Amino acid sequence: MGPVSARRSRLRPEISLILFQVGMVGACTVYVLQPGYLEVDYGSDAVTMECNFSTVGCPPVPPKSLWFRCGTHQPEALCLDGCRNEADKFTVKETLDPDQVFLTVNRLSPNDSAIYICGIAFPNELSPSAKHVGKGTTLVVRERLFSKEVRSFLIVLLALLSVYITGVCVTFIVLFKSKSNGPRSRETKGSKKKSARRIFQEIAQELYHKRYVETSHLPEQEGTDENRKALPNPGRA
């Protein structure tokens, strides 16, 4: 705030001189109030600063408003011709109810960052209090970090990145589900193989058991027949 205060201090004598030439003295008193700080983006087309003033003991005639700019260069007076054309760099609009004056800065650029001071004076009054300046509004125009082309490219890139991340997540979910279903299918196939093998073994054991029983009965029957033949027949004797 040091350099800003210094510029304001250097600017006040020059502004007072201009206001003194505009209005020379009486019993009228003017009070001026301005917003202290205003910050806008470089992408804005225009910005409007307000200047509120009040009067005591002044004639019922419109006062004259003057605007001054104090930047990195020499202080300069703005809109000495009124700046009523909206096509100009600066446009001044006055409203008397309430007592307000507006300065619009068109076609904003970073070079428009400065202190804008509003001065109000009654030209036909001789009192020094009939002219007064505000403390000034510090206008800061922020430069954009990226151009429109770069911002559009970043938006498209972000959209593509979102689509890519979504695709990767979907692929991961599908692979995870397929892997989780794989062991289950293998377990099902293995259980089916085991059950078929068990059934085959049971059938083989049953066939083996039947064959063993048949073969074991056959020698016993042959031995019984031979014994019957060896016994003497009572009828023949």
UniProtKB/Swiss-Prot annotation:
PROSITE patterns: IG_LIKE. Keywords: Disulfide bond, Immunoglobulin domain, Membrane, Signal, Transmembrane, Transmembrane helix. The chain crosses the membrane at residues 153-173. It comes from the Eukaryota. Residues 215-229 have a biased composition (Basic and acidic residues). SUPFAM superfamilies: Immunoglobulin (SSF48726). Residues 1-27 form the signal peptide. InterPro entries: Ig-like_dom, Ig-like_dom_sf, Ig-like_fold, IGSF6. Residues 30-134 form the Ig-like C2-type domain. Residues 28-152 are extracellular. It is found in: Membrane. Residues 174-237 are cytoplasmic. The keyword Transferase does not apply. Residues 215-237 are annotated as: Disordered. It is a single-pass type I membrane protein. Disulfide bonds join 51-118. Ubiquitous with higher expression in immune tissue. GO terms for cellular component: membrane. Its main location: membrane. This gene is coded entirely within the intron of Mettl9 which is transcribed in the opposite strand of the DNA. This is Immunoglobulin superfamily member 6. The lineage of its organism: Eukaryota, Metazoa, Chordata, Craniata, Vertebrata. The gene is Igsf6.
